Amino acid sequence: LSMTDADWQRIETIRGKSATDWKEVHPFHGKTDAGHEAAWIRFLAGDNDDYPERILHATEQIVRRRLALTREDTSVGTRHHVHHWQWANPVSSEALVQLTLGAPQQIYNGGLLHTRLRYFDTQRRCPGLPADVAALVEKIEAERTVVRLVNLSGNETRELILQAGAFGEHRFGTAAWSSRTSVW
């Protein structure tokens, strides 16, 4: 969260000593619903361009596998292992938190979610992205966040308010944007 050069250098030092490939994405889902921080950091550093597609694909695999486990589960009652439903839970938020909010996954047992951005749907008057709107946080720097917003609706306009920080703890000093429409 500090975004200092010294902290970034610490990350690079750790990466240099790591025996694992920091670009790898694996379709796994533990109790933390996390584990891809290194690959996400490499994406933010501009060194893992296809990370968004790969983490979304891995997440889809996790969801499909967990839904199959739930469908195949014939047990009833309360005599399950203490982690029975945790193992079969198809909800996975890691990719969406990283890619749309610009944040690492929160700690699974109650940690606060510290994000760079949050969204407010002005038409529905509720937090979150409007229907048919995609967001990708492409870069995070100490004084700059780059997010790409795309309206995927073929015929409806969408409006949203882009806010700084999950709790309003950040401020936008300036904003720049560009827009374009599809040519097809």
Where are the language model's segments positioned?
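Catalytic domains of carbohydrate-active enzymes that cleave complex glycans
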Residues: 1-148, 152-154
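Residues in well-ordered beta-strands of folded domains
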Residues: 138, 163, 176
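Surface-exposed beta-strand/loop patches in extracellular or lumenal glycoproteins
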Residues: 153-168
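Intrinsically disordered, low-complexity Pro/Gly/Ser/Thr-rich segments with frequent PxxP/GP/PP motifs
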Residues: 168-184
